[in-house]
């Protein structure tokens, strides 16, 4: 019997599934909550411009969510929302996208006052290794007065793994709404507080429905395997040109696929056994078959 596959809530495709439907009250609620908890923007109306899930070329292009927002003040702004991989390898790319989006707003000879600010919300499944902040904002700021009101770029980096430290410091019962939201996204379907907030309840309901769709489920899992390969490659250094199947990578991949299973049996295996397990995990082999082959 196949072991149950768990897809993390920050999975690119699943995350878009949570918020893509403009006609769905739950999707609108989650998206509004994400925007208002992470940024100072207060939304009156929301519209997802690229609402198609686009599973036919999903693995070829990241699912960046383009959102048109009408604020409480009546202003219209565009926000890009995305769940993605490593901060160090991608944060300059997102700055480039922001500058490019600004440049495309006007043509030569147009008035510059027509330029509208660009907002990005980017969720990373990692820690903030430099400042250890849950949210880090990037904008063009006045050095003396630390004022970014005139900035055309506002990028919000969310480091989901920082929630672990916050929970240890404050306790789960003292999380604010932003922290609660990040905790649910980070912990996913196995979150022990998933039914304690409306966002968690909606995500749980949508997750169960998502997992019933074989095409969506398989596409999301294929992405997880590909994403792990990229992360492992990055960690080991691009110059090596291949994924090193180290002990830490095997354990990390195993925990990604089987979050509730014991990992102690993986600790004292040989390098050859680690390589065999890694390959079998990539090929979606049954857990019992893996243990039998390894002799556990």
Show the residue positions of the predicted features.
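Conserved single-residue anchors adjacent to enzymatic active/cofactor-binding motifs
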Residues: 1-218
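Short, charged alpha-helical interaction segments and adjacent helix-coil junctions
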Residues: 2-6, 77-82, 182-296
